[in-house]
């Protein structure tokens, strides 16, 4: 289940589809035709592992981690000890993983990459949200995201307590200096924007 995904511009169905696509792409990039090193481990060898935080953070990306391991091996079991959006401490155990050693070894890097990237975004957002607490200001994101991780990073912003300004070019007008220069003047582009809005 996606936590904190109730923002009206981020339907959970689209986010879930995005997670699947991102995870499949990441695994294809990292694993390719197979994990040569993991194949050195006996195929029936089982293992247990834990993900432990190295520093304080806001946890974000649980669904991506689950999807990474599930994509490699649906039989890998993950028991989470924290919830999405929780503020965790250094050395805190986040989850315990069990299953075939090969599967755990193959999926771990992709899973950790998503967890670290999204938790970093959520953590930094939470820092700024706390800094403006008590004011009328609001922390909003931009489109300056890592390519192919737009939905993921914007989701992480909401987990950190921020808001989504717009998801992409198709769902809102945001006039910048380059648009004004291309249109010829502020008046010209505002006229076009008002005409677009009236339609």
Give residue spans per PLM region:
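Acidic/glycine-rich phosphate/pyrophosphate-binding loops and surrounding catalytic core
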Residues: 2-199
């Amino acid at each position: 289940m996606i936590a904190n995904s109730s923002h009206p511009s981020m339907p959970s169905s689209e986010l879930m589809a995005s997670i699947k696509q991102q995870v499949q792409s990441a695994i294809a990039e990292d694993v390719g035709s197979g994990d040569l090193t993991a194949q050195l481990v006996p195929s029936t060898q089982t293992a247990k592992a834990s993900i432990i935080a190295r520093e304080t953070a806001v946890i974000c990306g649980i669904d991506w981690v689950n999807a990474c391991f599930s994509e490699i091996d649906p039989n890998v079991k993950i028991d989470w000890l924290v919830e999405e959006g929780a503020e965790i401490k250094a050395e805190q155990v986040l989850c315990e993983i069990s299953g075939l050693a090969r599967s755990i070894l193959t999926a771990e890097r992709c899973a950790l990459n998503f967890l670290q990237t999204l938790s970093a975004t959520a953590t930094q957002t939470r820092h700024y949200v706390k800094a403006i607490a008590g004011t009328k200001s609001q922390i909003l994101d931009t489109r300056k995201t890592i390519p192919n991780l737009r939905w993921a990073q914007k989701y992480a912003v909401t987990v950190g307590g921020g808001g989504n300004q717009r998801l992409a070019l198709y769902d809102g007008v945001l006039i910048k200096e380059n648009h004004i220069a291309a249109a010829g003047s502020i008046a010209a582009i505002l006229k076009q924007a008002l005409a677009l809005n009236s339609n």
